[in-house]
UniProtKB/Swiss-Prot annotation:
Zn(2+) binds at residues 190, 198, 201, 204. It comes from Thermoplasma acidophilum (strain ATCC 25905 / DSM 1728 / JCM 9062 / NBRC 15155 / AMRC-C165). Pathway: Purine metabolism; 7-cyano-7-deazaguanine biosynthesis. It is an enzyme of class 6 (ligase). This is 7-cyano-7-deazaguanine synthase. The gene is queC.
Amino acid sequence: MERKKAVVLLSGGLDSSTVLAYAISLGYEVHAISFDYGQRHSREMNSSEELAKYYGVDRKIVHVDLRSIGKSALTDDIEVPSRDLESIPEEIPVTYVPARNTIFLSIAAAYAESIGSTDIFIGANAIDYSGYPDCRPEYFNAMEKALTLGTEIGLRKGMHINVPLQYLTKADIIRMGLKLGVPYEKTWSCYKGGEKACGECDSCLLRLKGFMEAGSEDPLEYEKYPTFYKDYIEKRKK
Protein backbone atom coordinates (compact mmCIF):
# COMPACT_ATOMS: atom_id res chain seq x y z
CA MET A 1 0.00 0.00 0.00
CA GLU A 2 1.38 3.40 -0.99
CA ARG A 3 2.16 5.66 1.95
CA LYS A 4 0.40 8.98 2.31
CA LYS A 5 2.62 11.92 1.39
CA ALA A 6 3.16 15.04 3.47
CA VAL A 7 5.12 18.26 3.02
CA VAL A 8 6.99 19.39 6.14
CA LEU A 9 8.32 22.94 6.46
CA LEU A 10 11.86 22.39 7.71
CA SER A 11 13.76 25.47 8.86
CA GLY A 12 16.43 23.58 10.76
CA GLY A 13 15.14 24.80 14.11
CA LEU A 14 14.03 22.91 17.19
CA ASP A 15 10.31 23.04 16.42
CA SER A 16 10.46 22.08 12.75
CA SER A 17 12.85 19.20 13.45
CA THR A 18 10.44 17.85 16.05
CA VAL A 19 7.57 18.08 13.57
CA LEU A 20 9.68 16.31 10.94
CA ALA A 21 10.29 13.40 13.32
CA TYR A 22 6.62 13.39 14.33
CA ALA A 23 5.34 13.22 10.74
CA ILE A 24 7.74 10.37 10.02
CA SER A 25 6.54 8.55 13.14
CA LEU A 26 2.98 8.74 11.80
CA GLY A 27 4.06 6.82 8.72
CA TYR A 28 4.00 9.63 6.16
CA GLU A 29 6.27 9.72 3.15
CA VAL A 30 7.80 13.04 4.06
CA HIS A 31 8.94 15.67 1.59
CA ALA A 32 10.75 18.52 3.36
CA ILE A 33 10.78 22.07 2.07
CA SER A 34 13.22 24.75 3.27
CA PHE A 35 13.22 28.45 2.46
CA ASP A 36 16.28 30.58 1.82
CA TYR A 37 14.69 34.00 2.25
CA GLY A 38 17.74 36.13 2.99
CA GLN A 39 17.72 35.39 6.71
CA ARG A 40 20.81 36.51 8.61
CA HIS A 41 20.72 33.27 10.61
CA SER A 42 21.57 31.26 7.47
CA ARG A 43 23.17 28.61 9.69
CA GLU A 44 19.68 27.11 9.98
CA MET A 45 19.83 26.18 6.28
CA ASN A 46 22.84 24.00 7.05
CA SER A 47 20.91 22.46 9.92
CA SER A 48 17.91 21.68 7.73
CA GLU A 49 20.23 19.95 5.25
CA GLU A 50 21.80 17.86 8.03
CA LEU A 51 18.39 16.91 9.40
CA ALA A 52 17.05 15.88 6.00
CA LYS A 53 20.10 13.67 5.48
CA TYR A 54 19.81 12.25 8.99
CA TYR A 55 16.20 11.19 8.38
CA GLY A 56 16.75 10.24 4.75
CA VAL A 57 14.01 12.49 3.35
CA ASP A 58 13.87 14.53 0.17
CA ARG A 59 14.39 18.26 0.73
CA LYS A 60 13.45 21.00 -1.66
CA ILE A 61 15.05 24.44 -1.27
CA VAL A 62 13.03 27.45 -2.39
CA HIS A 63 14.66 30.88 -2.71
CA VAL A 64 12.41 33.78 -1.72
CA ASP A 65 14.04 37.21 -1.48
CA LEU A 66 12.30 38.71 1.53
CA ARG A 67 15.23 41.09 2.05
CA SER A 68 13.83 43.12 -0.85
CA ILE A 69 10.64 43.63 1.17
CA GLY A 70 12.43 44.37 4.42
CA LYS A 71 11.16 45.48 7.82
CA SER A 72 12.52 42.60 9.88
CA ALA A 73 15.56 42.13 12.07
CA LEU A 74 15.92 38.65 10.58
CA THR A 75 16.53 39.97 7.06
CA ASP A 76 17.62 43.62 7.43
CA ASP A 77 20.29 45.60 9.23
CA ILE A 78 18.01 45.97 12.24
CA GLU A 79 19.53 44.96 15.56
CA VAL A 80 18.27 41.71 17.07
CA PRO A 81 17.49 42.64 20.69
CA SER A 82 19.50 41.06 23.51
CA ARG A 83 17.54 40.82 26.74
CA ASP A 84 16.63 38.64 29.68
CA LEU A 85 13.76 36.18 29.82
CA GLU A 86 11.41 38.50 31.72
CA SER A 87 11.67 41.27 29.12
CA ILE A 88 10.52 39.27 26.08
CA PRO A 89 7.65 41.43 24.77
CA GLU A 90 4.09 40.29 24.14
CA GLU A 91 3.67 42.71 21.24
CA ILE A 92 4.88 41.90 17.73
CA PRO A 93 8.72 41.93 17.89
CA VAL A 94 11.21 43.30 15.36
CA THR A 95 12.10 39.71 14.39
CA TYR A 96 8.66 39.28 12.79
CA VAL A 97 9.03 38.82 9.02
CA PRO A 98 5.98 40.32 7.22
CA ALA A 99 3.58 37.57 6.06
CA ARG A 100 6.34 34.93 6.19
CA ASN A 101 4.14 31.97 7.07
CA THR A 102 1.54 33.02 4.51
CA ILE A 103 4.20 33.04 1.79
CA PHE A 104 5.77 29.79 2.95
CA LEU A 105 2.49 27.92 3.34
CA SER A 106 1.31 29.04 -0.10
CA ILE A 107 4.48 27.68 -1.69
CA ALA A 108 4.29 24.52 0.42
CA ALA A 109 0.71 24.02 -0.78
CA ALA A 110 1.84 24.34 -4.39
CA TYR A 111 4.55 21.75 -3.75
CA ALA A 112 2.07 19.47 -1.97
CA GLU A 113 -0.36 19.70 -4.88
CA SER A 114 2.43 18.87 -7.35
CA ILE A 115 3.16 15.58 -5.55
CA GLY A 116 -0.48 14.72 -4.89
CA SER A 117 -0.45 15.53 -1.17
CA THR A 118 -3.08 17.29 0.91
CA ASP A 119 -1.09 17.44 4.14
CA ILE A 120 1.29 20.20 5.22
CA PHE A 121 3.09 20.12 8.57
CA ILE A 122 4.48 23.25 10.23
CA GLY A 123 6.21 23.65 13.59
CA ALA A 124 4.42 26.80 14.74
CA ASN A 125 3.46 27.27 18.35
CA ALA A 126 0.78 29.46 19.95
CA ILE A 127 2.12 29.43 23.52
CA ASP A 128 5.84 30.26 23.28
CA TYR A 129 5.37 32.04 19.96
CA SER A 130 7.03 35.35 20.85
CA GLY A 131 4.18 37.54 19.56
CA TYR A 132 4.00 36.51 15.89
CA PRO A 133 0.51 37.01 14.37
CA ASP A 134 1.00 34.17 11.87
CA CYS A 135 1.53 31.59 14.61
CA ARG A 136 -1.97 31.89 16.08
CA PRO A 137 -4.60 29.12 15.79
CA GLU A 138 -7.11 31.45 14.10
CA TYR A 139 -4.52 32.27 11.45
CA PHE A 140 -3.95 28.61 10.57
CA ASN A 141 -7.69 27.93 10.45
CA ALA A 142 -8.15 30.78 7.98
CA MET A 143 -5.10 29.78 5.92
CA GLU A 144 -6.29 26.18 5.67
CA LYS A 145 -9.62 27.38 4.29
CA ALA A 146 -7.85 29.62 1.77
CA LEU A 147 -5.59 26.81 0.54
CA THR A 148 -8.54 24.43 0.29
CA LEU A 149 -10.45 26.94 -1.83
CA GLY A 150 -7.42 28.03 -3.82
CA THR A 151 -6.04 24.68 -5.02
CA GLU A 152 -7.45 22.06 -7.37
CA ILE A 153 -6.59 19.22 -5.02
CA GLY A 154 -8.04 21.22 -2.14
CA LEU A 155 -11.40 21.52 -3.88
CA ARG A 156 -11.46 17.76 -4.40
CA LYS A 157 -10.01 16.50 -1.13
CA GLY A 158 -9.39 19.47 1.16
CA MET A 159 -5.99 20.87 2.13
CA HIS A 160 -4.85 20.24 5.69
CA ILE A 161 -2.39 22.34 7.68
CA ASN A 162 -1.16 20.20 10.55
CA VAL A 163 0.18 22.18 13.51
CA PRO A 164 0.96 19.45 16.07
CA LEU A 165 2.92 21.75 18.40
CA GLN A 166 0.27 24.45 18.46
CA TYR A 167 -0.75 24.16 22.09
CA LEU A 168 2.50 22.80 23.53
CA THR A 169 5.01 24.70 25.61
CA LYS A 170 8.64 24.66 24.51
CA ALA A 171 9.33 22.17 27.30
CA ASP A 172 6.53 19.91 26.03
CA ILE A 173 7.97 20.09 22.51
CA ILE A 174 11.44 19.15 23.74
CA ARG A 175 10.09 16.22 25.77
CA MET A 176 8.22 15.05 22.67
CA GLY A 177 11.33 15.40 20.52
CA LEU A 178 13.53 13.53 22.98
CA LYS A 179 11.07 10.63 22.97
CA LEU A 180 11.18 10.66 19.16
CA GLY A 181 14.98 10.72 19.21
CA VAL A 182 15.38 14.13 17.55
CA PRO A 183 19.10 15.02 17.24
CA TYR A 184 18.79 18.49 18.77
CA GLU A 185 22.54 18.99 18.44
CA LYS A 186 21.93 19.33 14.69
CA THR A 187 19.31 22.07 15.08
CA TRP A 188 19.73 25.85 15.15
CA SER A 189 17.44 28.42 16.77
CA CYS A 190 19.49 31.61 17.25
CA TYR A 191 18.33 34.73 15.38
CA LYS A 192 21.88 36.05 15.05
CA GLY A 193 24.35 34.81 12.48
CA GLY A 194 27.31 33.86 14.66
CA GLU A 195 29.33 30.66 14.89
CA LYS A 196 27.73 29.92 18.25
CA ALA A 197 24.20 30.62 19.42
CA CYS A 198 24.14 33.99 21.20
CA GLY A 199 22.13 33.00 24.29
CA GLU A 200 20.52 36.46 24.40
CA CYS A 201 17.90 36.69 21.63
CA ASP A 202 14.27 35.70 22.22
CA SER A 203 14.71 32.41 20.38
CA CYS A 204 17.76 31.35 22.39
CA LEU A 205 16.10 32.31 25.68
CA LEU A 206 12.90 30.39 24.93
CA ARG A 207 14.92 27.38 23.81
CA LEU A 208 17.10 27.33 26.94
CA LYS A 209 14.07 27.86 29.16
CA GLY A 210 12.40 24.93 27.40
CA PHE A 211 15.33 22.58 28.01
CA MET A 212 15.46 23.67 31.64
CA GLU A 213 11.74 23.07 32.18
CA ALA A 214 11.98 19.74 30.35
CA GLY A 215 14.67 18.66 32.81
CA SER A 216 17.28 18.25 30.10
CA GLU A 217 20.39 20.04 28.82
CA ASP A 218 20.68 21.81 25.48
CA PRO A 219 23.43 20.10 23.42
CA LEU A 220 24.24 23.36 21.59
CA GLU A 221 27.10 25.60 22.68
CA TYR A 222 26.31 29.26 23.41
CA GLU A 223 28.36 32.45 23.41
CA LYS A 224 26.67 33.49 26.63
CA TYR A 225 24.43 31.55 28.97
CA PRO A 226 21.66 33.44 30.80
CA THR A 227 21.78 33.37 34.59
CA PHE A 228 18.66 31.22 34.96
CA TYR A 229 20.22 28.48 32.80
CA LYS A 230 23.63 28.64 34.48
CA ASP A 231 21.92 28.26 37.87
CA TYR A 232 19.93 25.31 36.52
CA ILE A 233 23.07 23.53 35.26
CA GLU A 234 24.83 24.10 38.59
CA LYS A 235 21.90 22.52 40.45
CA ARG A 236 21.97 19.51 38.10
CA LYS A 237 25.62 18.91 38.95
CA LYS A 238 24.91 18.68 42.68
